[in-house]
Amino acid sequence: MARFIAQLLLLASCVAAGQAVTAFLGERVTLTSYWRRVSLGPEIEVSWFKLGPGEEQVLIGRMHHDVIFIEWPFRGFFDIHRSANTFFLVVTAANISHDGNYLCRMKLGETEVTKQEHLSVVKPLTLSVHSERSQFPDFSVLTVTCTVNAFPHPHVQWLMPEGVEPAPTAANGGVMKEKDGSLSVAVDLSLPKPWHLPVTCVGKNDKEEAHGVYVSGYLSQ
């Protein structure tokens, strides 16, 4: 019983508080786990997991007797290192799917300690505009599309002068998920002749904002 109580006290003193880490897409970051103990030999077993929905834990890799093994799907994007009593998971955030919660499990004999960290992967906003005329025979409408690519919350809208006749009309082009996991949002603006009025596309992603002004077939930044 005394041994059991001692292990519980050790467990309580060894669990470090979780941290939130933010990485831009493509950036390399490090998640850290620390065991507050006088000395840890190579016999400690350390495992890092990616947490999924519910109770799902997907093993990324493990280290035991200073031998490191990374599971096949995570090779090239994850690595494990150690410095004394501190254990590192190095993440190359190459995809938005690397966003989420991670768990480090440290086990020595019958004692087990866990620590959870959160990684937020973001992609800076990019804004693009292109135009296309309506088809033969009238060529009377110019459709201008504004696309914003970002993560986690891309948003796009057109700003137009008031009182313009005939008034331009906007239509949501939908949301598309890119290969890197980021999101692209597009809004089409239909401009009847004449096409010379200036319109402004505004793209946002949380605290980011970008503008593109479209005038007579030209986009000025």
UniProtKB/Swiss-Prot annotation:
Q: List the disulfide bonds.
A: 146-201
Q: Which UniProt keywords apply?
A: Disulfide bond, Early protein, Glycoprotein, Immunoglobulin domain, Oncogene, Repeat, Secreted, Signal
Q: Name one GO molecular function term.
A: identical protein binding
Q: What is its main location?
A: secreted
The segment(s) forming the Ig-like domain are 21-120, 124-220
Q: Which Pfam families match?
A: BARF1_ig2 (PF22305)
Note the superkingdom of the native organism. Answer: Viruses
Q: What is the stated purpose of this protein? A: Plays diverse functions in immunomodulation and oncogenicity, maybe by acting as a functional receptor for human CSF1. May inhibit interferon secretion from mononuclear cells. Exhibits oncogenic activity in vitro.
Renumbered to this chain, the signal peptide range is 1-20
Residues linked to a glycan: 95
What is the protein name for this chain? Secreted protein BARF1
Q: How does it assemble?
A: Homohexamer. Interacts with human CSF1.
Q: Which organism is it from?
A: Epstein-Barr virus (strain B95-8)
What Gene Ontology cellular-component terms does the record carry? extracellular region
Q: Explain the post-translational modification.
A: Phosphorylated on serine and threonine by host.
Q: Where in the cell is it found?
A: Secreted
Q: Does the keyword Secreted apply?
A: yes
